[in-house]
């Protein structure tokens, strides 16, 4: 007989809860890793009895703290520790990027496990990423190999969405930028991940947009509890309950599509007809899993979690960087007209949009989504090439400081839309380095090493499709009275979520 265990929580005596807390604390002490000897840049100050103030200083001023930390250790190890909202982390100079890019004892999966409670119900989208290679295989092979097949459908979706949400109004009118860019990216991504039957489903779009944020908030809620109590606490914490409900809703939306396709395939086999193939992630995941079990809803949410908010942020920042640069917008229009004068989307289209590629890469360089990347957890004590020791259990990140280094980029604090285009001129040996999809220690917008974002080729294609439609179909500028500012919180940087732009429909010179 099934028993609802939730009411049991109310029956715990206070002394029992205290006992569990004490036991969990003892467990942490007994299993704790040995302490790092690296300097701490934002420890407790005099008369501070905890690290709450240190966390506040980190959230408000992480960029300066990391810059100061790198300056302090530049003549020694090039590594230091910093108190974050999730505990103490080790920050490495970008000079270590090659050291750790493929180190067998430094694990991305282990870092995700420590950060995201993957064994608790509701966090299934993270769990399928760290416990299986299906997602990574699907993105690296099927998604990247099918870019030519999915570009035209994304363009069709952009036409539908812009007409509906950006409208054909030829008068200047103000719109909130983030909801507009989020709508584009969510719908274009969903067209690729789930096909045309689901990509415009408002319930799916709501879930796919909200699950990422809600799961991060749920993870933050759980971190307030001792680790041993988190599975119990997750039963009643509001955000944890919310993401479990979203996962169930996702299953209810996706499973009928899978069932319908399975029946159609069985019928085709019965009649001796060829089975219909689909250019979407439902098909690719099924092909990649073969005999392996998988959770379709969790995997679809994993794809959305990885793709939507990151691409939305870069699209929004790029649009803001274009605002007020009318000559640059005209240059981009001329490039688009030149590329599309002889036809539509084909294998060479994305490569030919070199100025657009440079603009996006420069937007990402000036304002990436984080000032430190390459998160890894040491699964053993790790000795780096210069002798620096990373203790077992320590989570490390690599600073992105070379992205603003004057020795790498002249006038690094200035947005130069032609910076990477100039590197791709005939005879240059920087053609590969200068492309948007090329990660390096000098440009870690998509990370670096074997865990560099596997979906960066798709993201680049999606961004270019969206920008082609926006640039050709609309005039746009920052709305009167709006002064967009980068939102900073800890190591995270976000395009101004409250920014408004003024837009008006224009007659495009080419159609897609």
Curated annotation (Swiss-Prot):
Q: Which GO terms describe its cellular component?
A: membrane
Q: Name one GO molecular function term.
A: heme binding
Q: Which residues are glycosylated?
A: 86, 149, 210
Q: How does it sit in the membrane?
A: Single-pass membrane protein
Does the record bear Membrane in its keywords? yes
> Which EC class is the enzyme in?
oxidoreductase
Q: Which InterPro entries match?
A: Cyt_P450, Cyt_P450_CS, Cyt_P450_E_grp-IV, Cyt_P450_sf
Protein's GO biological process: mycotoxin biosynthetic process; terpenoid biosynthetic process
- Identify the residues that bind heme: 453
Main location, first listed in the record: membrane
| Keyword Electron transport applies | no
Q: What Pfam families does the record point to?
A: p450
Q: Which UniProt keywords apply?
A: Glycoprotein, Heme, Iron, Membrane, Metal-binding, Monooxygenase, Oxidoreductase, Transmembrane, Transmembrane helix
Which cofactor is essential here?
heme
Which biological pathway?
Secondary metabolite biosynthesis; terpenoid biosynthesis
Span-the-membrane segments of this chain are 12-32
Q: Which family does it belong to?
A: Belongs to the cytochrome P450 family.
Q: Per its database record, what is this protein's job?
A: Cytochrome P450 monooxygenase; part of the gene cluster that mediates the biosynthesis of andrastins, meroterpenoid compounds that exhibit inhibitory activity against ras farnesyltransferase, suggesting that they could be promising leads for antitumor agents. The first step of the pathway is the synthesis of 3,5-dimethylorsellinic acid (DMOA) by the polyketide synthase adrD via condensation of one acetyl-CoA starter unit with 3 malonyl-CoA units and 2 methylations. DMAO is then converted to farnesyl-DMAO by the prenyltransferase adrG.
What is the designated name of this protein?
A: Cytochrome P450 monooxygenase adrA
- Tell me which species this is from: Penicillium rubens (strain ATCC 28089 / DSM 1075 / NRRL 1951 / Wisconsin 54-1255)
**Encoding gene (name):** adrA
């Amino acid at each position: 007989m099934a028993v609802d265990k939730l009411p049991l929580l109310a029956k715990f005596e206070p002394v029992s809860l205290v006992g569990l807390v004490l036991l969990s604390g003892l467990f942490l002490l007994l299993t704790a890793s040995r302490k790092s000897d690296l300097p701490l840049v934002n420890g407790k100050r005099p008369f501070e009895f905890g690290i709450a103030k240190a966390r506040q200083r980190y959230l408000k001023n992480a960029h300066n703290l990391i810059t100061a930390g790198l300056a302090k250790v530049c003549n020694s190890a090039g590594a230091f520790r910093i108190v974050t909202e999730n505990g103490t982390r080790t920050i490495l100079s970008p000079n270590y990027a090659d050291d750790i890019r493929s180190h067998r004892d430094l694990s991305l999966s282990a870092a995700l496990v420590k950060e995201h409670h993957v064994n608790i119900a509701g966090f299934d989208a993270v769990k399928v990423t760290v416990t299986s290679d299906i997602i990574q295989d699907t993105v690296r092979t099927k998604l990247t190999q099918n870019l030519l097949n999915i570009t035209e459908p994304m363009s069709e979706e952009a036409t539908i969405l812009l007409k509906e949400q950006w409208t054909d109004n030829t008068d200047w009118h103000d719109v909130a930028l983030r909801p507009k860019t989020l709508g584009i990216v969510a719908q274009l991504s969903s067209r690729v991940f789930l096909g045309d039957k689901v990509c415009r489903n408002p319930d799916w779009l709501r879930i796919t947009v909200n699950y990422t944020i809600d799961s991060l908030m749920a993870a933050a809620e759980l971190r307030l509890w001792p680790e041993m109590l988190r599975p119990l606490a997750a039963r009643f914490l509001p955000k944890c309950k919310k993401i479990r409900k979203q996962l169930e809703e996702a299953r209810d939306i996706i499973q009928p599509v899978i069932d319908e396709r399975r029946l159609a395939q069985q019928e085709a086999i019965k009649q001796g007809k060829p089975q219909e193939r689909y250019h979407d992630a439902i098909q690719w995941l099924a092909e990649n899993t073969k005999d392996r079990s998988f959770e379709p809803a969790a995997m679809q949410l994993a794809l959305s979690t990885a793709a939507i908010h990151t691409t939305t942020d870069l699209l929004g920042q790029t649009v803001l960087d274009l605002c007020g640069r009318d000559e640059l917008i005209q240059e981009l229009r001329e490039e688009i007209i030149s590329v599309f004068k002889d036809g539509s989307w084909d294998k060479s289209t994305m490569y030919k949009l070199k100025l657009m590629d440079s603009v996006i890469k420069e937007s990402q360089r000036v304002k990436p989504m984080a000032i430190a990347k390459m998160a890894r957890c040491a699964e053993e004590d790790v000795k780096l090439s210069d002798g620096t020791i990373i203790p077992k259990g320590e989570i490390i990140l690599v600073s992105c400081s070379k992205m603003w280094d004057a020795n790498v980029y002249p006038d690094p604090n200035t947005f130069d839309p032609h910076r990477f285009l100039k590197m791709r001129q005939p005879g240059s040996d920087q053609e590969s380095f200068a492309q948007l999809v090329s990660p390096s220690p000098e440009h870690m917008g998509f990370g670096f090493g074997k865990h560099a974002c596997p979906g960066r080729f798709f993201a680049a294609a999606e961004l270019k499709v969206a920008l082609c439609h926006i640039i050709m179909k609309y005039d746009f500028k920052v709305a009167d009275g709006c002064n967009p500012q980068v939102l900073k919180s800890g190591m995270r940087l976000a395009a101004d979520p409250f920014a408004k732009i003024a837009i008006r429909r224009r007659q495009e010179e080419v159609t897609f």
